[in-house]
């Protein structure tokens, strides 16, 4: 299998950072990737990550790294506001791309990256993880097998980064959304520390209804009280429902919990499969099983499986011409749902059709806030913004209360 040379920009400030987790996963996929270089403006983080993962080629200047190393793939793991700048730069250097979620701050910004990739003949995968989790892949199989009968509706509670939740629902339903009704309000709240470390006393509440092509309705809520559930979703059909990681069938009112099996790989206990109906002799359906395609690498934790799946998707697209498993189309749609919900809320809660046909007022405010904070437009002033210090807390937070 062809090995691709991958460079990572943004190595995380801490050993437990998400970027370091990705580096650890990449190192396990030795037949797919070799880490040729890492890049970060924080010298301390750069040296720590270089030592931790034994990467000799370390850069603080991104373009210098691209010119010297000429990586096949660039993985952009900088803060959200900086992703478009580094992604556009890498694409213009004819590097294949993986970027962190979401698609982009606005649909137009993401479309600019997609266009740059097309113009330079490179692939772009977006690192949406939720639908790749083993439990979620099993849910997708359960619905495809028809155990729930005709799907009628879904319920979603998601506290931050709701494009993740929309992604989970869409992938289980395997259907396209057609229209959205949204409600949103900024609320006073007891003082708390935000993701960026600042004291905040406001929080956004959101509620929405999403209609899908197959006559399924999704009811969505995000609020400070959703901590009661955490991030939780349910899929209901005429024959039963999925709630969290349980299947309930109306016939006999039988509940089936997801069952995990493990193998010993290199002395480690590694997830081999997750399924339903294997150990229940009374079940009236054949067992349904998801098997871990990465167990030979010792990859076991749910989010590590997701990371490996994302990396594998791009590798296959580059080396074999296979379609990306997620890609721009899905990433755009998940972000578009959130933007459409806020458009509906801003227009006194009217139904809005999908796809959107022009930039929304929210997207225009996001672009204006970006220019105000960083001094330029990321699409037209890309080179000038490469040396900017991008904040951990995105303009999505200051404008919309989104993470």
Spans of features found by a protein language model:
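Short, conserved SAM-binding/catalytic segment
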Residues: 49-55, 113-117
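Beta-strand-loop-alpha-helix segment that lines the small-molecule cofactor/substrate pocket
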Residues: 66-68, 73, 79-80, 84-131, ...
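N-terminal Rossmann-like dinucleotide-binding module
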Residues: 1-53
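Rossmann-like NAD(P)H-binding beta-loop-alpha module
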Residues: 134-153
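Conserved SAM-binding strand-loop segment of SAM-dependent methyltransferases
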Residues: 55-62
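Rossmann-like dinucleotide-binding domain that binds NAD(P)(H)
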Residues: 151-236, 246-250, 329
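Glycine-centered short loops/turns at secondary-structure junctions
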Residues: 94, 121, 215, 348-349
